[in-house]
Amino acid sequence: MSESVQEAKSALSKIRNIGITAHIDAGKTTTTERILYYTGVSHKIGEVHEGNTTTDYMAQERERGITITSAAVTCEWNDHRINIIDTPGHIDFNIEVNRSLRVLDGAIFVIEGVAGVQPQSETNWRLADRYNVPRIIFINKLDRTGADFYYAFSTLKEKLDIVAVPLQLPIGAEENFIGVVDLVEMRAIVWEGGELGAKFHYEEIPDDLKEKAAEARQTLLDTALAMDDAAMEEYFEKGDVDVAILKKCIKKGAISGEFRPVMCGTAFKNKGVQPLLDAVIDYLPAPDEVEGIRIAPPEGEEVDEDFLPIVPVDPDGKFAGLAFKIISDKYGTLTFVRVYRGVLNSGDTILNTTKGHKERVGRMFQMHADKRQEVKSVGAGDIAAFVGLKDTVTGDTLADAADPVVLERMQFPVPVIDISVEPKTKDAVEKMTLALQKLTAEDPSLHLKTDQETGQTILSGMGELHLDIIVDRLRREYGVDANIGAPQVAYRETITKPHVETYTHKKQSGGSGQFAEVKIEFAPSEKPDEIIFENKVVGGTVPKEYIPAVEKGIRMQSTTGVLAGFPTVDFKFTLLDGKYHDVDSSALAFEIAAKACFREGMKNAGPVILEPIMDVEITTPNDHVGDVVGDLNRRRGIIQNQETAGSTVMIRAQVPLKEMFGYISHLRSATKGRASFTMQFHHYDPVPRNVAEEIIAKSA
């Protein structure tokens, strides 16, 4: 191994790429701010309620006190570089969590000390499971009235179905919370007043916690040492184990997912953050300590992903990286890239292997939220922002042309709400179009289309807040004032039974005419969210060169369903037979025939309208439960379960999105502002007949 490669591998061991994620208001941005303060990135602690945080740098984020985008921040701790991504908690911005977890090696899950595990934490946890991201849990806000570490801890098993192992226990509760018991070193860590939590000291474990700490330490030893036979043997021989060995076992368990280490504190009151940083270094993996990334299966092929080759993180290989975020600002377009293999220098030309074209990297930056530090090269394990890429979007692979690997693709959620967007002046049409193109390039969960009948520009997103933010950005960042239509449900159409349709397209108007005949079977798809095409033509009744035109015609026509003009989804179409004419047939003729065949065939295949069904979770005081449940029933909701925690009740229901517009105002009014709710897309379901008739009549 060359000296330079050895140096690169050594440097790699000192990198941590982590995300901080949680339910909205659990304190993840506050936790990030404390980390930046203690690591010296910022010299003043920003506060969410004051609108001056480092990672929430967009105007809308500071006004609303929520995180909208994933801000990337680099900091140093104990001779290690930590790249942190602070992600949104609001479900409307789940795309940001998805793409961040996709490129990280570890994560801190911030859990609120009063409520415990909440819906968005569950959603994010499942996403992290999908990408096998090692995790540390930080139970936060233990200074709050009603905070209970042990209750919050119990929700980890109950709602996430995991083996959670505390590495700390709290000292004191609510306003008397002063520190933690460190179960690894078996000592108390107590924070001193003033100096924004920068000063703390170690002392003996308080007498009233010694028994509880001994029990928790035993649980930690039993669980962690099971990861290493030699460590377990040493423990049996000596009755204890060296701290370094115990830490190594905890790290092994955290990376494998056998158990999840749990820390605690209160970021807002500056207690518990430094040990959390130590835990990031001690227990979360360096880039080369995780499996790496799978290559993508060939386009259109079904392959068991367990058999796909893995690209390991390797500084000595040919360059390969994944673009996971695009930002347009006053300086141009920034493309955030996670590097998995090799080294790249500014000015190099690389291949976008997803699209098959070359890109030249102009400059590269390490980001500190909206501030940037230029770097001349990046290597395996790095996260950096590239300037100069012309045609690269989220999810594209960038690689050395000598080894044009395509990395595993990202999956993005389906938008469920539409609004129409029209500029207030004709002069602003082009300006608005360019702005919306930039915004949709940044955000793959945002879709843009033109209504074929009205000519209106339609913007589709994940929720009312999502679209509200986009409209606000149009005005602030791009100077476009627009008239916005009321939010509309993004309905879909599908079919419920198979049907075979034959259609002949014949046109003769002097000279050569047009002729094409197709026989197509339409059937419900066995795979959700997919339109599948199969060609079963034999004997050349439809020449091979015209087959793509048939597929193109059906896919184009499927954007306008036969019932109410909504996109048709979840169906399979099979070309069975057809006829052609030596002179009059053409690709265009077969495309036209396929479109007409779709229009006629779908009418006889049991078409139905689908509506988005949302998972709704409402937290309400006991005395309002009856009113809330009754109202949900009136909204066609189906109650899933109810859980009581003290004087509040958590109600889970599935409710059609159509019935949830404006719900927050109604809920506040009905409960005098004491209830709250979260909502996220769950699935599409056929609408009842009376609702379908209403929708069809409105679209006529």
UniProtKB/Swiss-Prot annotation:
Q: Which residues bind GTP?
A: 22-29, 86-90, 140-143
- A single Gene Ontology molecular function, please? GTPase activity
Q: Which Pfam families match?
A: EFG_C, EFG_III, EFG_IV, GTP_EFTU, GTP_EFTU_D2
- Alphabetized InterPro entries for the sequence: EFG_II (IPR041095), EFG_III (IPR009022), EFG_III/V (IPR035647), EFG_IV (IPR047872), EFG_V (IPR035649), EFG_V-like (IPR000640), EFTu-like_2 (IPR004161), G_TR_CS (IPR031157)
Q: What does this protein do?
A: Catalyzes the GTP-dependent ribosomal translocation step during translation elongation. During this step, the ribosome changes from the pre-translocational (PRE) to the post-translocational (POST) state as the newly formed A-site-bound peptidyl-tRNA and P-site-bound deacylated tRNA move to the P and E sites, respectively. Catalyzes the coordinated movement of the two tRNA molecules, the mRNA and conformational changes in the ribosome.
The portions of this protein that span the membrane are: none
Q: Which NCBIfam families match?
A: EF-G, PRK12740.1-5, small_GTP
The gene name on file is fusA
The tr-type G domain sits at: 13-288
Q: Which PANTHER family match?
A: RIBOSOME-RELEASING FACTOR 2, MITOCHONDRIAL, TRANSLATION ELONGATION FACTOR G-RELATED
Q: What's the name of the protein?
A: Elongation factor G
Predominant place of localization: cytoplasm
Taxonomically, the superkingdom here is Bacteria
What is one term from the GO cellular component aspect held by the record?
cytoplasm
Q: Which UniProt keywords apply?
A: Cytoplasm, Elongation factor, GTP-binding, Nucleotide-binding, Protein biosynthesis
Where does the UniProt annotation locate this protein? Answer: Cytoplasm
Q: What family, per the record? A: Belongs to the TRAFAC class translation factor GTPase superfamily. Classic translation factor GTPase family. EF-G/EF-2 subfamily.
Query: One GO biological process from the UniProt record?
Result: ribosome disassembly
